[in-house]
Amino acid sequence: MIRRLIIAICLVFMYTISCTSPQNLSKTDKQILKFTIIGDSYSTYDGWNNKGNDFATYYPTSSVTDVSDVAYTWWYKLHYTPEFQLEKLNAYSGSTISYKKGSTVFKEGDKRSFCSGLSQSDMGNPDIIMIFGGTNDAWNNTDADLGYYKYDDFTQSDLEYFRPAFAYMIDYLIRNYPDARIFNITNSGRGGKPEGGLTQGIADSMEEICRHYNVTNIILPSILDSGKTNRHPNKEGMVIIFEQVYSALKKDLVVKTI
């Protein structure tokens, strides 16, 4: 009798666990994961940036874009899903990851550089931090500006080069936001500026540095010409970015929590 009672209790317990597992929770019961973005023009939208109009925006003011509503942006589509919610948007049109953009070297605190503006950024309290940049580094700098791989003892002169700047950025985020998962998004069009994407050197550097820090690198598929206007994602391109990022986040977060 006692044995049957114990078995019955165990079965009820197992059933309760299975019913409350992430796979079986209703949309209203699921944990909402907050995400913060550090990005360039691809992630801007007027009035939605963390510091309002203090950040330069590309969307929707560009005369050539059809992204005329915030609902068309990749990150708003992600915000509209049941699992994720936008925490902070730190995106500045024309910004680079390194301190250098062509012949210009940014000073500490300048928001036009991901690295120099990190200490000034309000990241909120995110569960996820996504880095989506490198495009302006590719468009304005050369392979000579890649620099060497370096993972500690960073100097300000190091941060004028892409590799140490990108490593510093991830290192900073890991140290200052230990409870957040960090993801990097590698732009499409790897191999050349004419495609509106990254040079091979920058794309490969991102992959290597993400591997070093055990950061998930979401590599976007090539966005065809129909998905870009003036080298920037249009509505079609935004859908492609959203679908890839959404799929990668769900897959990676489920795998990591098992």
PLM regions: where:
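Conserved SGNH/GDSL esterase-like catalytic core that processes O-acyl groups on lipids
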Residues: 51-147, 151, 193, 198-200, ...
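Structural recognition of the beta-strand scaffold that forms the well-ordered cores
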Residues: 34-39, 43-44, 86-91, 127-133, ...
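Short glycine-rich His-centered loop
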Residues: 25-68
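Positively charged n-region of N-terminal signal peptides that target proteins for export
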Residues: 1-4
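Bacterial N-terminal signal peptides
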Residues: 7-16
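Histidine-centered active-site loop/cap adjacent to the catalytic His
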Residues: 228-258
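Substrate-gating cap/lid alpha-helix
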Residues: 180-221, 244
